[in-house]
Amino acid sequence: TYVQMLTENTPNIRGLAQAFGMEYIPGPWMDAIQVSKGTSSVLNGYEAIAGQINVEYLKPQTQDPIALNAMISTETHAEVNVTGGWDLNDKVATGILFHAQNMSLELDHNHDGFLDMPKNTNVNLLNRWYVKTGDYTGQFLVRGLYDRRQGGLTKEATSALSPYKIDLNTWRVDGFMKNGYVFDADLGTSIGIITSASYHNQQNTYGSRQWNAAQTNAYLNAIFQTSFDDSATDLWDDHHHNLSAGLSFNYDGYNEAIRLIGDEAIR
């Protein structure tokens, strides 16, 4: 894709997660969606060509203490969301976001023997922390995810010796740490360090073929910012001279195995 997908300004939706990545972000978890056009700034990532889409999760210091919503459709799509944020004291806040959904009914409205849409089970749990002490601000987040999708022939159409079935199983864990320190508020002199990591594991079956894959990602972004003049009322107006410098590091490690059922794996 030419558009870089970010969560909390970290390149979280990439590689193996790109196929269903946006579905791993439940709507009730979103605090804001930020869209930019054109090539990206190195401040938030250098991989975008046509633009960036950044999703901000609910913040524990501003979200409701508890919020619950649940739904079920006529086609047995059931979903529940629980979110909550609490101020532990005047410096520390924490929040929990939970999502679960299940679609277990086999739908074949055109009666061709294949599922119109995959059966799906998804469980998603996130915990984040916010710390503010003096000139230091820190944010910490960890999330775990399980997702299963089943498609192919319906039960009524599986009389064949080798019925075509699709079974996608995904386990994922990711998280980040954001640390920022302000040295001079008048000049806007500060340093920010973002680190994130993720592990994504997929075990998939497509008929008589299996494709298993795992991805490990590590990301580091460190930015130093300052202004050369404290006379303006707005540190970032058009008449102010500012400096932003830093470094960015991104690592992806992949491990894949493809085989026919009963054969040795090809890695």
Which positions does each model-derived feature cover?
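Short acidic/polar hinge/loop motifs at secondary-structure boundaries
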Residues: 10-37
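Short strand-turn segments of transmembrane beta-barrel domains in outer membranes
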Residues: 34, 39-41, 52, 57-86, ...
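Transmembrane beta-barrel domains of outer membrane proteins
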Residues: 36, 56, 83-87, 97, ...
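Flexible loop and strand-edge segments within Gram-negative outer membrane beta-barrel domains
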Residues: 103-126, 130-191, 197-217
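Extracytoplasmic beta-strand/coil segments of soluble accessory domains associated
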Residues: 1-11
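Short loop/turn motifs that connect adjacent beta-strands in outer-membrane beta-barrel proteins
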Residues: 44, 60-65, 90-92, 134-137, ...
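Transmembrane beta-barrel strands of outer-membrane/channel proteins
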Residues: 68-72, 96-102, 140-146, 193-199, ...
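Signature of Gram-negative outer-membrane beta-barrel scaffolds
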Residues: 236-267
